[in-house]
Each structure stands twice: as C-alpha cells, then as structure tokens.
C-alpha cells in the first residue's frame, strides 16, 4: 500500500519538522517572512514531546517561540471551523495571563503574539489579518496582545497560478502544503532544500506513519459519531424535551471523547454547560 505523504498543513508534521532543535533556522526563516522582522535568536518551548514519542499528544498550543521581546504562539488550523477563533483566543489569553502573572510588574514591553496558519478561509479573502484589542474608535486597550491570521488558501492558489516571480517571493509559505512531487518541482534555496529533506525524513519514519494512521482512524470514527449525533438531535423532538435530549447527546459524545468544542457546535449548549455535565 502506498503510504500517505503528510504536509505541514498537518500540525503533527509541522511540529516534527519545525520544532526539531536542529531545524531552528527553518522556523526562523518562516517567522521572519510572516512577521517581517529580523530574528537574531529564538528559543523553542516544547509544548509536547516530539520525535522521541510521536504517540503522545495533549491539548496545548502547537508551538511556542521566544525571540527578543516577543512570545509567539503558532497554531496550525488545517480547516476553518467556528470553534477555532474562541479556542485559539483562549490559548493566547492563557499565554498572556501566564506572562503577566510571572512578571514583577504589569507592563507591555513584551509582545504576546499568536500566528494562525489557517486553511479554509477562501483564496479571495485577505492574505493576512492582524487583530488587536481596541475600542470601536481604534483606541488600543493594550498594545502587546496581537493575533495574525494567515490565509493559507492564498498561497495554495499562488502555487497553481504558475506565476514564477510570485512563487519565488513566497516559497516558505507555499512549501508547507506541497506533496512530495510538487516539492521536487518547486524553486529552491537552502531553506527549501532543508525543509524538503526533513519533511521527507519525518514521513519515512514508521512510527510517525503509524501514529498518523491511528489518528485518521480516530477522526473517521469521530465524524461518524458526530453525524449520528446530528441526526439524533434533528429527529428527536426539538420541542419540550429539547434540553434533556441535548444533555443526553452531550453525555454520549463526552463518553466517546469528542471535543467539547465540537459538542457545543452540534448541540448548541455552551462550553460551560457541557463542562458541568462532566
């Protein structure tokens, strides 16, 4: 059977490639391109174990990087879902809170930054959107809370446009979601060459392939359960007994280890209400 080639649109592949200490130059080049800054030194904070044990996964941020006066959380969103923005906001708020509580005083000298690499926004949407906390008149509440959402569909479209000049300008973004054959055919520099070598090594790792196969099987099972839950919710009455029915559905889904965000999206129950059910 032909094995799947996982691009860095997949968060596990991204972590295995970019959070490898030997590949800090790859992460540096990527962040410099996105943020348009010069990075002299960066420190990668491991948010979960990497190549030593690809079978261990928790619900922490995808990547956390310290550089200069910035703490950068990187999130890989392989598809756009309604729960993503609240979840990712919770992540950056947690980072902001942690930094603020540790410091000796409240100040805004360190930027708390989140970079979202998001697929599914639509190629015609803005290439990058910057979000900050401000009033409706544009007055900043704090200056060091910053979220960037990168529209990865734009870079996919750029690759298929065959515009060589634009492709060369955006290599580090485009390469993230190219398959093995496409990577062979793209323009290259030292960073691209090293990326291709490392993403290939990751995909050739039997443990990585085993982990990914198991993850895909879990997703298929979860999708089936989600469909069943939606159908049950649709046909179950939706009148006087709606609350009990929703709670029952939520309990069953919790027992199947379906994420609280998905349960909330399907049942309409708040995250807080679902947590109280537990």
State what each model feature region is.
Residues 1-208:
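Conserved single-residue anchors adjacent to enzymatic active/cofactor-binding motifs
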Residues 2-4, 68-77, 174-278:
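Short, charged alpha-helical interaction segments and adjacent helix-coil junctions
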